[in-house]
A protein has these predicted regions:
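Short Fe-S-cluster ligation motifs
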Residues: 334-353, 371-378
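Alpha/beta enzyme core
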Residues: 2, 68-216, 222-237, 284, ...
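N-terminal capping/small domains of soluble enzymes
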Residues: 1-63, 68-73, 255
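Extended, intrinsically disordered, low-complexity segments
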Residues: 194, 199, 257-306, 311, ...
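Short secondary-structure boundary segments
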Residues: 6-8, 94, 160, 242-243
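Iron-sulfur cluster-binding cysteine motifs and their immediate structural context
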Residues: 308-326, 342-360
Length: 378
């Protein structure tokens, strides 16, 4: 393992206070985290001395210097200083969404020409390999990722934070966090962005050019299962930040332990044997098998009679659940059920509603179907 040092720039930010906000549900730990922080607020001589000391103290760990310039000269200087400090690798950050200059951060990351150019500048200024950190604030990440590779990047990192407004103060009528009555659009991270991150990792791995270079995955990683999902979609190494801010470095030990147990249970000897194993199973919507439906079954012993499945199906699906108000027991109407599994996902009782009978739309059909497994990991 190793560390990615907080992004270093020639520009030293004057940070606002407060600068964090969260999105949560019903008092649970936050699922989303908004930050209005920019690059490192320390002088560069301090930053590079930290990198130098880290490499001295942990010579067998990978130390990555993350840099962000606003001009050719700045990218070149930061790359050279990173190498002098003893970093093993350089990450070019083209993706921070809350920079105060349009010449830095995600504004650059949305411009493939600038991404390519700055990668050329950085890579020509150092012998160290560079990777380009992509912004998710666009439609097709493959375009700037290809540009980065053309510019000399040896790998891609994805994703950085998503532009957001998490909450509003409805009394002051402004966003949060509130800074003297105002707020700003800024980066969103945490578990809530994992689906977005996984989608971009999949997109990159389906690109014939980008998939040939290593991908560093990040965005919503909290557990060992999250780690596995990124690895299976093609990320060969991972970054974790927001979860460490929430739970501390100890969660990394849990991640390593969980992955190790999974590998032992499945007889997997090398972590690399996991990487990319799910890529081929992510296909276009038109390639999905639509010849059958999977009905659901309700365990009447586990059912608590809350009626949530009935309400959701009646108001937002196909009215395929009948509810006995006297006994508070729901029943599936198999003729109406389309197998959408909305009820399964709203049920608050674990394993109360589960996949049931497979029904082919053409009654003469009986081809083999791969179904979701139910085991201790799911």
């Amino acid at each position: 393992g190793g560390i990615f040092y907080k992004t270093i720039s020639v520009f030293i930010p004057n940070e606002c206070s407060p600068r964090f906000d969260i999105a949560s549900k019903e008092g649970t730990p936050w699922t989303g985290f908004k930050n209005m922080e920019m690059t490192s607020d320390k002088p560069n001589e301090v930053n590079f001395e930290f990198i130098r000391q880290l490499k001295k103290d942990f010579p067998n760990k990978v130390i990555v210097s993350s840099i962000m310039g606003a001009s050719d000269d700045e990218w070149a200087i930061l790359a050279k200083e990173s190498e002098k400090a003893g970093a093993d690798m350089i990450e070019c950050n083209f993706s921070c969404p809350q920079m105060t200059s349009s010449t830095m951060g995600s504004d650059v990351g949305q411009n493939p020409d600038l991404v390519k150019h700055y990668c050329e500048v950085a890579s020509s200024s150092t012998k160290l390999p560079i990777i380009a950190k992509m912004t998710p604030n666009l439609g097709n990440m493959e375009i700037p990722a290809r540009a980065a590779i053309e510019g000399g990047a040896k790998g891609i990192a994805a994703i950085n934070t998503v532009k957001s407004i998490t909450n509003l103060d409805i009394n002051l009528r402004t966003g949060m966090p509130v800074v003297n009555g105002k707020s700003a659009i800024s980066g969103y991270s945490g578990a809530a962005v994992k689906p977005i991150a996984l989608r971009f990792i999949s997109d990159l791995m389906h690109d014939p050019i980008v998939s040939k270079v290593p991908i560093t995955g990040m965005g919503g990683i909290e557990t060992w299962r999250d780690c596995l999902e990124f690895l299976m979609l093609g990320a060969s190494n991972l970054q974790v930040t927001t979860a460490v801010m929430q739970y501390g470095y100890r969660i990394v030990e849990d991640m390593i332990s969980g992955i190790s147990h999974y590998m032992n249970d499945y007889g997997i000897n090398k972590l690399q044997d996991i990487v990319g194993t799910a890529v081929g199973n992510i296909v276009g919507a038109d390639d999905l098998d639509r010849s059958y439906k999977i009905l659901v079954q309700i365990d009447k012993e586990k059912c608590v009679g809350c009626g949530r499945c009935y309400v959701s199906c009646f108001d937002a699906a196909h009215q395929a659940i009948e509810y006995d108000y006297a006994t508070r027991v729901p029943t599936i109407n198999e003729d109406k059920c389309v197998g959408c599994h909305l009820c399964l996902n709203v049920c608050p009782v674990m394993h109360c509603i589960q996949p049931g009978k497979l029904v082919y739309k053409d009654k003469k059909d009986n081809h083999a179907v791969t179904l979701k497994e139910s085991n201790s990991y799911l």
